[in-house]
A protein has these predicted regions:
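STAS-like cytosolic regulatory interaction modules
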Residues: 1-88
Length: 88
């Protein structure tokens, strides 16, 4: 299960909280949410404090978002290591 919620939003920025497991179909849901935020020309950041696990597709999405300058905040050491080790 994955929960995505808006933590804060202004004219220029939006911060989403991502909680749970970023796996399977939930990866596409996060992709849709981040695309919607980016399409509004807002700076996007993700609070990953309560993200417990990512599969290889979730890790790939988070790496792609990082390359697009999406800030990833409060990432646990476990998730950080998964992002470094996981390959498709």
């Amino acid at each position: 299960m994955l929960r995505i919620s808006v933590m804060s939003e202004s004219e220029k920025a939006i911060q989403l909280r991502v909680e749970g497991w970023l796996v399977g179909a939930w990866v596409d849901e996060l992709r849709l949410q981040t695309q919607a935020a980016c399409s509004q020309a807002k700076t996007l950041s993700l609070d990953l404090e309560k993200l417990w696990f990512v599969d290889s597709h979730g890790a790939a999405l988070l790496r792609d978002l990082a390359r697009q300058n999406v800030a990833q905040l409060n990432c646990s050491p476990f998730i950080d290591q998964q992002l470094k080790e996981t390959t498709l």
